[in-house]
Amino acid sequence: ITGIRTLGATQFVFVDTPGFQTKHSTALNKSLNKTVMGAIGDVDLILFVVEAGNFTLADAKVLSLFKPGIPTLLIANKLYRVHRRGDIAPWLRDMQERHPFTEFVPMSAKKRDDIQRLLGICAPYLPQQPWFYGADELTDRSEKFLASETVREKLFRFTGDELPYTSTVVIDKFDEAGNRFQFPELRNVEDVFP
Protein backbone atom coordinates (compact mmCIF):
# COMPACT_ATOMS: atom_id res chain seq x y z
CA ILE A 1 0.00 0.00 0.00
CA THR A 2 1.34 3.43 -0.90
CA GLY A 3 0.81 6.28 1.54
CA ILE A 4 1.35 9.85 0.37
CA ARG A 5 2.06 12.92 2.49
CA THR A 6 2.77 16.30 0.91
CA LEU A 7 4.23 19.03 3.11
CA GLY A 8 5.20 22.28 1.40
CA ALA A 9 7.51 21.47 -1.50
CA THR A 10 8.22 17.92 -0.27
CA GLN A 11 6.20 14.86 -1.17
CA PHE A 12 6.75 11.70 0.88
CA VAL A 13 5.70 8.44 -0.75
CA PHE A 14 5.64 5.62 1.78
CA VAL A 15 5.61 2.04 0.55
CA ASP A 16 4.08 -0.08 3.30
CA THR A 17 5.20 -3.62 2.67
CA PRO A 18 3.56 -6.68 4.19
CA GLY A 19 5.45 -8.24 7.05
CA PHE A 20 8.12 -10.73 6.00
CA GLN A 21 6.74 -14.22 6.55
CA THR A 22 9.09 -16.71 8.20
CA LYS A 23 6.71 -19.21 9.83
CA HIS A 24 4.79 -20.63 6.86
CA SER A 25 5.90 -21.33 3.31
CA THR A 26 2.53 -21.13 1.57
CA ALA A 27 2.20 -19.66 -1.92
CA LEU A 28 0.62 -16.52 -0.42
CA ASN A 29 3.51 -16.02 2.01
CA LYS A 30 6.08 -16.57 -0.74
CA SER A 31 4.29 -13.96 -2.85
CA LEU A 32 4.22 -11.49 0.07
CA ASN A 33 7.94 -12.05 0.68
CA LYS A 34 8.67 -11.41 -2.99
CA THR A 35 6.75 -8.12 -2.70
CA VAL A 36 8.85 -7.11 0.31
CA MET A 37 12.12 -7.89 -1.48
CA GLY A 38 11.07 -5.97 -4.60
CA ALA A 39 9.99 -2.92 -2.62
CA ILE A 40 13.20 -2.74 -0.59
CA GLY A 41 15.30 -2.32 -3.73
CA ASP A 42 13.19 0.46 -5.26
CA VAL A 43 13.25 3.09 -2.52
CA ASP A 44 15.38 6.12 -1.66
CA LEU A 45 15.23 5.54 2.10
CA ILE A 46 14.33 2.58 4.30
CA LEU A 47 12.51 3.10 7.58
CA PHE A 48 13.19 -0.06 9.59
CA VAL A 49 10.53 0.06 12.31
CA VAL A 50 10.93 -2.18 15.35
CA GLU A 51 9.62 -2.05 18.89
CA ALA A 52 12.19 -0.24 21.04
CA GLY A 53 14.39 -2.75 22.85
CA ASN A 54 13.17 -5.77 20.84
CA PHE A 55 14.60 -7.64 17.87
CA THR A 56 13.06 -10.84 16.51
CA LEU A 57 14.17 -13.57 14.14
CA ALA A 58 11.76 -12.13 11.56
CA ASP A 59 13.39 -8.69 12.03
CA ALA A 60 16.81 -10.27 11.42
CA LYS A 61 15.57 -11.92 8.22
CA VAL A 62 14.22 -8.62 6.86
CA LEU A 63 17.38 -6.76 7.87
CA SER A 64 19.49 -9.29 5.93
CA LEU A 65 17.62 -8.31 2.74
CA PHE A 66 18.64 -4.64 2.82
CA LYS A 67 20.90 -3.68 -0.05
CA PRO A 68 24.02 -1.69 0.76
CA GLY A 69 23.93 1.94 -0.30
CA ILE A 70 20.31 2.64 0.61
CA PRO A 71 20.16 4.91 3.68
CA THR A 72 18.37 3.09 6.49
CA LEU A 73 16.84 4.69 9.56
CA LEU A 74 16.34 2.55 12.66
CA ILE A 75 12.95 3.60 14.01
CA ALA A 76 12.59 2.47 17.63
CA ASN A 77 8.83 2.68 18.07
CA LYS A 78 6.85 2.35 21.31
CA LEU A 79 9.61 4.06 23.25
CA TYR A 80 7.14 4.53 26.11
CA ARG A 81 7.49 0.80 26.87
CA VAL A 82 11.15 1.26 27.81
CA HIS A 83 11.05 2.14 31.50
CA ARG A 84 14.53 3.64 31.74
CA ARG A 85 16.16 5.31 28.75
CA GLY A 86 19.53 3.85 29.79
CA ASP A 87 18.11 0.38 29.09
CA ILE A 88 18.02 1.19 25.38
CA ALA A 89 21.80 1.81 25.03
CA PRO A 90 22.92 -1.89 24.94
CA TRP A 91 20.15 -2.69 22.47
CA LEU A 92 21.17 0.21 20.26
CA ARG A 93 24.84 -0.92 20.26
CA ASP A 94 23.67 -4.42 19.27
CA MET A 95 21.56 -2.97 16.45
CA GLN A 96 24.50 -0.92 15.11
CA GLU A 97 26.57 -4.14 14.99
CA ARG A 98 23.84 -5.82 12.96
CA HIS A 99 23.54 -3.10 10.31
CA PRO A 100 25.14 0.27 9.52
CA PHE A 101 22.03 2.34 10.21
CA THR A 102 22.22 5.91 8.94
CA GLU A 103 20.31 7.31 11.91
CA PHE A 104 18.53 6.15 15.05
CA VAL A 105 15.07 7.63 15.66
CA PRO A 106 13.44 6.85 19.02
CA MET A 107 9.74 7.65 18.94
CA SER A 108 6.13 6.77 19.55
CA ALA A 109 4.07 6.61 16.36
CA LYS A 110 1.04 7.69 18.42
CA LYS A 111 2.60 11.10 19.11
CA ARG A 112 2.02 13.75 16.45
CA ASP A 113 5.23 15.60 17.39
CA ASP A 114 7.26 12.42 16.88
CA ILE A 115 5.72 11.89 13.44
CA GLN A 116 6.54 15.49 12.45
CA ARG A 117 10.11 15.03 13.73
CA LEU A 118 10.45 11.81 11.71
CA LEU A 119 9.26 13.56 8.53
CA GLY A 120 11.83 16.29 9.14
CA ILE A 121 14.57 13.66 9.48
CA CYS A 122 13.45 11.87 6.28
CA ALA A 123 13.13 14.96 4.05
CA PRO A 124 16.87 15.52 3.35
CA TYR A 125 17.18 11.95 2.02
CA LEU A 126 14.55 12.46 -0.68
CA PRO A 127 15.66 13.28 -4.23
CA GLN A 128 14.74 16.60 -5.84
CA GLN A 129 12.24 15.56 -8.52
CA PRO A 130 8.68 16.24 -9.66
CA TRP A 131 5.92 14.84 -7.48
CA PHE A 132 4.42 11.48 -8.37
CA TYR A 133 0.96 12.35 -7.01
CA GLY A 134 -1.33 15.33 -6.55
CA ALA A 135 -0.89 17.42 -3.40
CA ASP A 136 -4.21 16.25 -1.93
CA GLU A 137 -3.78 12.51 -2.60
CA LEU A 138 -3.26 10.24 0.41
CA THR A 139 -2.88 6.84 -1.27
CA ASP A 140 -2.92 5.14 -4.65
CA ARG A 141 -5.70 2.78 -3.51
CA SER A 142 -9.46 3.14 -3.96
CA GLU A 143 -11.88 3.96 -1.15
CA LYS A 144 -13.46 0.53 -1.62
CA PHE A 145 -10.08 -1.13 -1.05
CA LEU A 146 -9.43 1.01 2.05
CA ALA A 147 -12.85 0.10 3.44
CA SER A 148 -12.18 -3.62 2.94
CA GLU A 149 -8.78 -3.30 4.64
CA THR A 150 -10.38 -1.42 7.55
CA VAL A 151 -12.93 -4.19 8.02
CA ARG A 152 -10.19 -6.85 7.73
CA GLU A 153 -8.01 -5.04 10.28
CA LYS A 154 -10.90 -4.83 12.74
CA LEU A 155 -11.66 -8.53 12.29
CA PHE A 156 -8.04 -9.42 13.08
CA ARG A 157 -7.94 -7.05 16.03
CA PHE A 158 -11.06 -8.50 17.65
CA THR A 159 -10.57 -12.18 16.80
CA GLY A 160 -6.79 -12.50 17.22
CA ASP A 161 -5.42 -15.85 16.13
CA GLU A 162 -8.92 -17.21 15.52
CA LEU A 163 -8.90 -15.77 11.99
CA PRO A 164 -6.43 -17.15 9.43
CA TYR A 165 -3.96 -14.62 7.98
CA THR A 166 -5.13 -15.55 4.49
CA SER A 167 -8.62 -14.17 5.14
CA THR A 168 -9.97 -11.69 2.65
CA VAL A 169 -12.79 -9.19 2.88
CA VAL A 170 -14.80 -8.78 -0.32
CA ILE A 171 -17.16 -5.84 -0.54
CA ASP A 172 -20.07 -6.63 -2.83
CA LYS A 173 -21.55 -3.14 -2.71
CA PHE A 174 -19.92 0.14 -1.77
CA ASP A 175 -22.06 3.27 -1.50
CA GLU A 176 -20.57 6.69 -0.98
CA ALA A 177 -23.05 9.08 0.65
CA GLY A 178 -21.62 12.61 0.75
CA ASN A 179 -18.55 12.57 2.97
CA ARG A 180 -19.75 9.48 4.85
CA PHE A 181 -19.12 5.92 3.85
CA GLN A 182 -21.59 3.21 4.68
CA PHE A 183 -19.71 0.08 5.54
CA PRO A 184 -21.14 -3.20 4.30
CA GLU A 185 -22.95 -5.68 6.46
CA LEU A 186 -20.98 -8.78 7.30
CA ARG A 187 -22.72 -11.72 5.72
CA ASN A 188 -21.79 -15.25 4.76
CA VAL A 189 -19.92 -15.63 8.02
CA GLU A 190 -19.41 -19.29 7.22
CA ASP A 191 -17.19 -18.19 4.30
CA VAL A 192 -14.95 -16.20 6.64
CA PHE A 193 -13.91 -19.11 8.85
CA PRO A 194 -12.28 -22.25 7.43
What residue ranges belong to the model's regions?
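Conserved C-terminal guanine-recognition region of P-loop GTPase G domains, centered on the G4
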Residues: 5-12, 30-104, 175-179
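P-loop NTP-binding site
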Residues: 143-194
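Conserved active-site aspartate in kinases
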Residues: 16
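Flexible beta-alpha connector loops of hexameric P-loop NTPases
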Residues: 20-29, 80
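Short, surface-exposed acidic/glycine-rich loop or hinge patches that mediate macromolecular interfaces
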Residues: 26, 53, 109-112
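Conserved substrate/cofactor phosphate-moiety recognition/catalytic segment
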Residues: 1-2
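Canonical P-loop GTPase G-domain recognition
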Residues: 70-73, 80-145
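Non-catalytic alpha-helical coupling and interface elements of nucleotide-dependent molecular machines
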Residues: 6, 41, 45, 67-71, ...
